[in-house]
Amino acid sequence: MIAARAANLQVAMKALALAVLALAYAAATARAEQCGRQAGGARCPNRLCCSRWGWCGLTDDYCKGGCQSQCRVSRDGGDDDVAAVLLTAPGGGRAGVASVVTSDQFERMLPHRDDAACPARGFYAYRAFVAAAGAFPAFAATGDADTRKREVAAFLAQTSHATSGGPYSWGYCYKEVKGATSDFCVPNARWPCAPGKAYHARGPMQIAYNYNYGAAGEAIGADLLGNPELVATDPTVAFKTALWLWMTARSPSQPSPHAVVTGQWTPTPADSAAGRAPGYGLTTNILTGGLQCAGGNGGADRVAFYKRYCDVLGVGYGPNLDCFGQAPFDGGIMSASAAK
């Protein structure tokens, strides 16, 4: 089963790489430094460490070696340390994504990610997910409690499908494509490839191509053009790239998945005519460029992951779960045969 899923994953990565092409336009909106003297003395949300360079995170790069504030936790701490220090809200309860999904629920959703058959075993830790989410304060913190749960379920479902070793408890089995036949380097003046580096699919959302690595790296404060391997060696960085893809709008006319699942996007008449409606299904349209929508299976596997995770979190599914019949935002079907 793992071998078959690996073959399917290679096909899916090609589709995903095409789907995120428009992210080059999002690079211009990359954020400035987040904390410390570079940001007027601001502190990081959710008690993340502020690095010497003014970025928020939980690894030793942030919490040691010139850390400016809230330097008490590093990635060496366990989940209990994260819960006790990083995630404590002013009232004493949990803050951020940890208030939506607990470590126990995370384990129930992804029980086989550390299986001996999974190349990513030991990589995708709950504490890394929580630390990365802290750099995106709106994630799992927009809307009412049910909306927040559905966003976490949707994000974990889409990333589980992208890294799956089988349905529907085998999410996060892979952290990068093995045996890539391309370095995924294309000419780009702003995000030129570093010599000898490969930008194949890595991380929970399987980010690919130099322009996406460059834009994501600038947004999260990491040199991913020079060190793309970080996405497969640092779990916090890996989750941050996935969250950047989730939170970033592709173009003025195409929303981010975050905006869709939190009810911040309203379809235009053109969207309605194209069959695009609010709901989990539209996130599949966005993330695959419509490959699984018009002529595909509507993202049935992705829906199954999503339903399972909503059940774990105890929340309803919401409307429009699949994307069958939706046109992609660019107005054309790229290759329905590439969908899986």
UniProtKB/Swiss-Prot annotation:
Cystine bridges: 35-50, 44-56, 49-63, 67-71, 118-173, 185-193, 293-323
Q: Which residues form the signal peptide?
A: 1-32
Q: Which UniProt keywords apply?
A: Carbohydrate metabolism, Chitin degradation, Chitin-binding, Disulfide bond, Glycosidase, Hydrolase, Plant defense, Polysaccharide degradation, Signal
* Pfam families, per the entry: Chitin_bind_1, Glyco_hydro_19
- Gene that codes for this? Cht7
Q: What is this protein called?
A: Chitinase 7
Per its record, the protein catalyses: Random endo-hydrolysis of N-acetyl-beta-D-glucosaminide (1->4)-beta-linkages in chitin and chitodextrins
Q: Does the keyword Disulfide bond apply?
A: yes
Superkingdom classification of source? Eukaryota
Under InterPro entries, the record lists:
Chitin-bd_1 (IPR001002), Chitin-binding_1_CS (IPR018371), Endochitinase-like_sf (IPR036861), Glyco_hydro_19 (IPR016283), Glyco_hydro_19_cat (IPR000726), Lysozyme-like_dom_sf (IPR023346)
Name residues in a coiled coil.
Answer: none
Q: What's the stated role of this polypeptide?
A: Hydrolyzes chitin and may play a role in defense against fungal pathogens containing chitin.
Q: Give a GO biological-process term.
A: polysaccharide catabolic process
